[in-house]
């Protein structure tokens, strides 16, 4: 089986086969562009902070505020992670930090939203359990489809093709 199957671990066999067919037939770019024609405009740490804070205020009003949010180079990220959520205690106050892979700086907004929602869900649920995914779906009703499309986007990146990169 293709080494791209690792992106789709845990998915039903028919979904994995469809995804691998898209990859093998070089159709991932076409699929993504037809579904998500434009990249988002969140292209700085400040804009990411504003974007993530607005989602947090809308869905997680009672959770503590962010300390920081920013894009990080892959070398600065945990292996194979597109995003990380960390928190630290300062006295009695908990500070949350979000780090999103800089690969997502040039991606469609729904895929960025899926990743930010995923990291925000860790504010309440530390583990990837039913409650965690229920919270993700509360914040993004189409979360499961977005997560699958995000995995296709990652496969496209590993092929060296970002359909949304802004070439100069």
Where are these predicted regions, by residue range?
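Histidine-centered acyl-transfer/condensation active-site motif
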Residues: 116
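Walker B catalytic acidic pair
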Residues: 119
């Amino acid at each position: 089986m293709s080494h791209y199957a690792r992106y789709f671990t845990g998915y039903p066999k028919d979904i994995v086969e469809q995804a691998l067919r898209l990859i093998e037939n070089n159709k991932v770019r076409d699929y993504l562009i037809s579904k998500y024609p434009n990249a988002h405009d969140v292209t700085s740490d400040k804009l990411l902070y504003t974007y993530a804070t607005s989602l947090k205020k809308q869905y997680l009003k009672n959770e503590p505020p962010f300390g920081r949010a920013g894009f990080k180079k892959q070398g600065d990220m945990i292996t194979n992670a597109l995003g990380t959520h960390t928190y630290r205690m300062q006295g009695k106050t908990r500070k949350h930090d979000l780090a999103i892979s800089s690969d997502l700086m040039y991606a469609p907004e729904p895929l960025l939203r899926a990743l930010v929602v995923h990291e925000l869900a860790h504010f309440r649920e530390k583990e990837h359990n039913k409650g965690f995914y229920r919270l993700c779906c509360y914040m993004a009703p189409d979360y499961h489809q977005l997560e699958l499309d995000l995995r296709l986007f990652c496969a496209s990146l590993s092929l060296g093709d970002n359909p949304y990169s802004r070439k100069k």
